[in-house]
Amino acid sequence: MKIKLEIKRLPHGANLPFPSYASEGAAGMDVVSAEDVILQPMQRYPVKTGFAVAIPNGYEIQVRARSGLALKHGIACPNAPGTIDSDYRGEVKILLINLGSEAFEIKRGDRIAQLILASVTQAVFCEVTDLDDTQRGHNGFGSTGI
């Protein structure tokens, strides 16, 4: 299934590719940086992409790290997956953190993250006095194994 997304190029996004799928079976669209940045170890930074997008109601865009950057350099999205809500119209920025031990240079045009379009189901809470019993019950963290 394909969903149409309206995208607005911002002035500092000139000549950059819009997010795109690297292969036919890819779930995530690669997104590139619209600026040069040097991320120091443990530094967090919202990297500009040079575009804004109109996401249809009932959808979100999830922001996830690129596996190669995470494996080779420790570059991650600290709030992964990040969420871009359907009512947001500002510039898409990618929050990155350098978990590596060396400074990491991002150049304008470098692929920095993946964007995944996902459907959203909103919950409606109904207060009750009791919940049904399950085998797991109140057992929390680590209760099903490590």
UniProtKB/Swiss-Prot annotation:
Requisite cofactors: Mg(2+)
Catalytic reaction equation(s): dUTP + H2O = dUMP + diphosphate + H(+)
Matching CDD domains: trimeric_dUTPase
Keywords attached to this entry: Hydrolase, Magnesium, Metal-binding, Nucleotide metabolism
E.C. no: 3.6.1.23
Keyword Hydrolase part of the UniProt annotation: yes
Catalytic EC class: hydrolase
Pathway(s) annotated for this protein in UniProt: Pyrimidine metabolism; dUMP biosynthesis; dUMP from dCTP (dUTP route): step 2/2
Residues engaged in binding substrate: R66, S67, G68, N79, T83, I84, D85, K93
GO process annotations (BP): dUMP biosynthetic process; dUTP catabolic process
Tagged with keyword Hydrolase: yes
One of the record's GO molecular function terms: magnesium ion binding
Highest taxon, organism lineage: Bacteria
Family: Belongs to the dUTPase family.
Known role: This enzyme is involved in nucleotide metabolism: it produces dUMP, the immediate precursor of thymidine nucleotides and it decreases the intracellular concentration of dUTP so that uracil cannot be incorporated into DNA.
Alphabetical list of HAMAP family matching this protein: dUTPase_bact
The name this protein goes by in its record: Deoxyuridine 5'-triphosphate nucleotidohydrolase
Source species: Zymomonas mobilis subsp. mobilis (strain ATCC 31821 / ZM4 / CP4)
